[in-house]
Swiss-Prot record:
A GO CC annotation given for this chain: cytosol
Annotated spans, Disordered: 185-211
BP terms from Gene Ontology: chromatin organization; negative regulation of transcription by RNA polymerase II; regulation of transcription by RNA polymerase II; regulatory ncRNA-mediated gene silencing
Other facts: Present with 1500 molecules/cell in log phase SD medium.
Family annotation (Pfam families): HDA2-3
Keyword presence, Nucleus: yes
Name by which UniProt lists this protein: HDA1 complex subunit 2
Length: 674
């Protein structure tokens, strides 16, 4: 949270925490420095004998180094704690290969440091911001680090992102050949109108071409160069520098028109000449975002400044320590507070980084976005440094290993210190690797069981699919059988009706075939013949009746067919007329719609509104003229009534008539004759 603002420089402190890996490395450092730091706090003299704890491989010292004093160990302790708070890789003193930094993935580089995670979110918020609502099209941001090694880690994080980078301190990991355009400068040899200065022209080389009064041909005949100039790059700029370089070069950032500063060094002083030059040249507010680890030694030293206290502590320099008693006491106090508060719970503050970046770029106050950054209040149990458990390292608990760090008891030289630090870090790394290996075994078993369960589930799904497919096939065959049965029943009914009709005809034919035999008497024969003749005549009459009826039906059918043809032709004519009418109606509707659009369109509305306004203006003018006319009439009437002008004119006319002279009542350019 911002606690200190100066003219055009707004400082905001962004709280960060420590990862579990950083906490374990801090506990390893505590195990090495606990005895010496406790002795320095109590004021005990430094021990001379070297008592190595059990577990350290003993060996002859071929290259003896001077023993480190309590003050030196305290400075080393403070420096290493600050390095771990920034990134665990900074604890390593040897050279880091550039190829490794270029190839390291972003996830692995930021996994061990919460500061790097916050920085990654900040630069992503800058890169993927809403450019339409952003006041600046291209953002120029400066990132200030403690050292060159930290700057290498930062550049490895930035590589591959949509930024143009410029390394101001140290050598770049990968030269992307980004060139920052030079700011326009005022040339003293050229006047404002483009003509050369007389003083400078006289002092110029005599071989140079003299000024002819015509403007110089500025046309660039290189097509390739023109095409390059036309390409506008809208990527943002990131400038990488260190605090040391910023202290020694006050014009380091003066020529880049910086919009924002992100400082990894929370002890960066706003009163530095480089920042003062940047403040004086800027015509805008420049926000400075400092990443500060909560409850760290830096937080303890900056607490008075964050709370806007008038008391200012002497801040530490990143390069070398001045042997000052007040500074040394402040270091011990900050480290003691870090030891007391290292196990206190820290709230993870949820910050909207996109909103924070937008607020900073717009020059607004961001205090309401950032949380309050105060030191935690310690209880008496946490402040009690006399307890042995206070100095005991408390590593993150592992499930499959329980390695304890013994406290180093005895003097240390720089070689022994580095060896022991590496030895304990390697032991912790092996424990973590074993924890990972043993922890992945049940995970693999669960993964295998889940795979088998998924395979069984797939088999069940396959069997369900096959069963469902067979069910559909059976249902289809049943439906087909039902349809065939229905069709067969219909055909059977038809055939049964035909059989009944044929049986009836057969019965009639059998009755006709029953003729009388020759043995029958003639009388019987005549009776049978007359009966047969009567029946035949009946059938003939019935056939004739049916034939006449059929003929009538055919004639009626022919008339209906003729009438149907006439109606069909009439229907075709009417339908064609209806189609033409529908087409005409459609055309009329489209034309009507277009006319409505024209009437309701902006052009017609604009002209109508303008005419309405003109009519309203003319009506207002007419009313004003009417009122003015009425006023003048009333005024004339009033004047005539007050001064009796009509009577005076009449008197003058009468006097003139009596005297025999001429009188002109109206004004004229011609002279009056009296």
């Amino acid at each position: 949270m911002s606690r200190k603002n100066s003219k055009k420089l707004k400082v905001y402190y962004l709280p960060v925490t420590l990862t579990q890996f950083q906490k374990d490395l801090s506990e390893i450092l505590i195990s090495l420095h606990a005895k010496s730091f406790k002795a320095s706090i109590i004021g005990e003299p430094q021990a001379d004998a070297v008592n190595k704890p059990s577990g350290l491989p003993a060996g002859p010292e071929t290259h003896p180094y001077p023993t480190l004093s309590q003050r030196q160990l305290t400075y080393i302790f403070d420096s290493n704690i600050r390095a771990i708070a920034n990134h665990p890789s900074l604890l390593v003193d040897h050279y880091m290969p550039r190829q490794l930094l270029r190839m390291e993935p972003t996830e692995s580089s930021i996994a061990g440091s919460h500061k790097f995670q916050v920085l990654n979110q900040l630069i992503n918020s800058i890169c993927f911001r809403d450019r339409e609502g952003s006041p600046n099209e291209v953002i120029k941001c400066a990132i200030i680090a403690h050292s060159i090694k930290e700057l290498d880690l930062l550049e490895g994080l930035i590589l591959g992102k949509k930024f143009r980078t410029k390394r101001l301190s140290g050598t770049s990991l990968y030269n992307e050949k980004h060139k920052f355009p030079n700011l326009p400068t005022v040339d003293s040899t050229i006047n404002k109108d483009g003509t050369p200065n007389s003083v400078s022209s006289t002092s110029s080389n005599s071989n140079s071409t003299s000024y002819t009064g015509y403007s110089k041909d500025d046309y660039d005949y290189s097509v390739k160069r023109n095409l390059k100039k036309r390409k506008i790059n809208t990527d943002d700029w990131l400038f990488l520098a260190t605090t040391k370089h910023l202290k020694h070069d006050q014009y380091l950032l003066a020529n880049y028109d910086i919009d924002m500063i992100i400082s990894f060094d929370p002890m960066l002083e706003v009163e530095l000449p480089a920042l003062q030059v940047l403040r004086n040249n800027a015509n805008k507010d420049i926000p400075i975002i400092k990443l500060l680890v909560q409850n760290s030694p830096d937080h303890y030293l900056l607490d008075s400044e964050i709370k806007n206290s008038s008391v200012k502590s002497s801040h530490l320099s990143n390069n070398g320590h001045v042997d000052d008693s007040q500074e040394y006491e402040e270091i011990k106090s900050s480290l003691l507070y870090f030891l007391q508060a290292r196990n206190a719970p820290v709230n993870n503050c949820e910050i909207d980084y996109i909103k924070l970046v937008k607020c900073c770029l717009e020059g607004k106050d961001c205090n309401n976005i950032l949380p309050v950054l105060d030191l935690i209040t310690l209880d008496e149990a946490s402040k009690d440094s006399s307890d042995s458990g206070f100095w005991q390292p408390q590593l993150t608990k592992l499930q499959y290993s329980s390695t304890e760090l013994p406290l180093w008891d005895g003097p240390l030289d720089i070689k022994t210190y580095q060896t022991e630090l590496m030895h304990r870090a390697v032991i912790r790394l092996r424990d973590i690797q074993d924890e990972y290996a043993k922890g992945t075994v049940p995970l693999y078993e669960k993964r295998l069981n889940e795979t088998q369960r998924q395979n069984q589930l797939d088999e069940i799904k396959n069997s369900v699919g096959l069963t469902f497919k067979k069910k559909q096939e059976v249902e289809k065959s049943i439906n087909d059988s039902e349809k065939r049965l229905k069709h067969a029943m219909t055909e059977s009914t038809k055939l049964q009706n035909k059989i009944n009709h044929l049986l009836k005809n057969r019965q009639e034919l059998e009755n006709f075939n029953k003729l009388p035999s020759n043995t029958i008497s003639s009388e019987n024969h005549l009776e049978e013949g007359s009966a047969l003749a009567d029946k035949l005549k009946e059938y003939i009459d019935k056939n004739a009746t049916l034939f006449n009826k059929l003929k009538e039906l055919q004639q009626a059918n022919a008339e209906k067919s003729k009438l149907n043809d006439e109606l069909r032709s009439k229907y075709q004519i009417e339908s064609s007329k209806a189609a033409e009418s529908a087409q005409t109606l459609k055309i009329l509707q489209e034309s009507m719609k277009s006319l409505e659009n024209e009437v309701n369109g902006p052009l017609t509305k604009f002209s109508t509104e303008s005419l309405k306004k003109e009519l309203e203006r003319l009506q207002n003018d007419f009313q004003s003229l009417k009122a003015r006319n009425k006023f003048l009439k009333n005024y004339i009437t009033l004047m005539n009534r007050q001064y009796d002008l009509k009577n005076k004119n009449n008197v003058q006319v009468e006097k003139a008539a009596a005297n025999g002279t001429r009188f002109r009542s109206t004004r004229s350019n011609t002279p009056n004759y009296t």
